[in-house]
From Swiss-Prot:
Encoding gene (name): hemC
Protein's job: Tetrapolymerization of the monopyrrole PBG into the hydroxymethylbilane pre-uroporphyrinogen in several discrete steps.
GO term, biological process aspect, one: protoporphyrinogen IX biosynthetic process
Protein name: Porphobilinogen deaminase
Modification sites for S-(dipyrrolylmethanemethyl)cysteine: C245
HAMAP family the record matches: Porphobil_deam (MF_00260)
EC supergroup of this enzyme: transferase
Record flagged with keyword DNA damage: no
Miscellaneous comment: The porphobilinogen subunits are added to the dipyrromethane group.
Gene Ontology cellular component annotations, sorted alphabetically: cytoplasm
Co-factor note (free text): Binds 1 dipyrromethane group covalently.
Pathway(s) it belongs to: Porphyrin-containing compound metabolism; protoporphyrin-IX biosynthesis; coproporphyrinogen-III from 5-aminolevulinate: step 2/4
């Protein structure tokens, strides 16, 4: 029996989504033994705020050690939250498969009487670790107190039970994958808050080259083409901006009636300025749509906002 070692971070969410991937792969390859290996990353060990890391321009915060394990042949497939994966892979690696995306939206969880973002009282304390969410909140509701909140899902939910936070904002996908959908009070629609590029999707990364064709074939068995088109548009937009996964950038692509619509957002960290635009086209031209939108927004001054977030 062939053995395939699947690498992942060791958080509750990372393990939940990796077990989901392995279950899908096992359905396609019942004669293969899949083994999960957990790997600690810099993001797991570093307690700095993501805002501080963004200012340093760090990339691969959550994935580098896992990619190193791939290159060193200690694992065969890596499972990542796609929003954490830089837009360029190291030489010798490739994204072999993107499974079907779950909900891309952000969600709000609040204390009694604080269940909707628009209804939060003036001065309410909202916790999030995301640079993008902080920039959005400061622009959308400058009257709110935006407070840093890092940690896994359980840690963040426990923090909400204390006195420091009135509400927190998380990715819907994490709560859905860890079977905590019932904790969600409000789904924040993309027309209000655009998610991170690739949010809600997973990436299966492998070594590239013909000697790895069989492993690539194993991973590709659960690839979803519709998700791939949407993700490609979002990530080409991010790449065209020259921004990383910790920049104050949002993007969301949808396909309806054979037309792909990509919305993009870039904001100042202090909420003083936002740029938002849309590009549409044939899903087959998803990469060009993303690049076109990036060019449009750079022409509107997006670069200055991205650069300021690094200072």
């Amino acid at each position: 029996m062939r053995t395939v070692t699947v690498g992942t971070r060791g958080s509750t969410l990372a393990l939940a989504q990796t077990r989901w991937v392995v279950a899908r792969l096992k359905e396609e390859w019942p004669d293969t033994d899949f083994r999960i290996q957990t790997i600690s990353t810099k993001g797991d060990r570093n307690r700095e705020s993501l805002e501080a890391m963004a200012q340093k321009g760090d990339k691969g915060f959550w994935v580098k050690e896992i990619e190193d394990a791939l290159l060193q042949k200690r694992i065969d497939i890596a499972v990542h939250s796609l929003k954490d994966l830089p837009t360029e892979q190291p030489e010798g690696l490739e994204v072999a498969s993107i499974p079907k995306r779950v909900d891309a939206r952000d969600v709000l969880i609040g204390k009694e009487g604080m269940k909707r973002l628009a209804d939060l009282p003036q001065g309410a304390r909202v916790g999030t670790s995301s640079v993008r969410r902080k920039a959005f909140l400061r622009a959308y509701r400058p009257d709110l107190q935006v407070i840093d909140l890092r940690g896994n899902i359980d840690t963040r939910l426990a923090a909400l039970a204390g006195d420091e936070y009135d509400a927190i904002i998380l990715a819907a996908a994490g709560l859905i994958r860890t079977e905590m959908r019932h904790r969600i009070d409000e789904f924040v629609e993309p027309d209000i808050l655009l998610p991170a590029p690739g949010q809600g999707a997973l990436a299966l990364e492998t070594r590239s080259g013909p000697e790895n064709d069989l492993t690539i074939e194993v991973a590709y068995a659960i690839h979803d083409h519709g998700t791939d088109d949407r993700i490609t548009a979002e990530r080409e937009f991010l790449a065209g901006l020259g921004a990383g996964c910790m920049a104050p950038v949002g993007a969301h692509a949808s396909i309806k009636g054979g037309v792909l619509t990509l919305e993009g957002w870039v904001g100042a960290l202090d909420g003083s300025k936002v740029i938002r635009a849309t590009s549409i086209g044939d899903p087959a031209e998803c990469a060009d749509i993303g690049a076109e939108l990036a060019g449009d927004m750079l022409g509107q001054g997006a670069q200055a906002l991205i650069d300021a977030a690094r200072e």
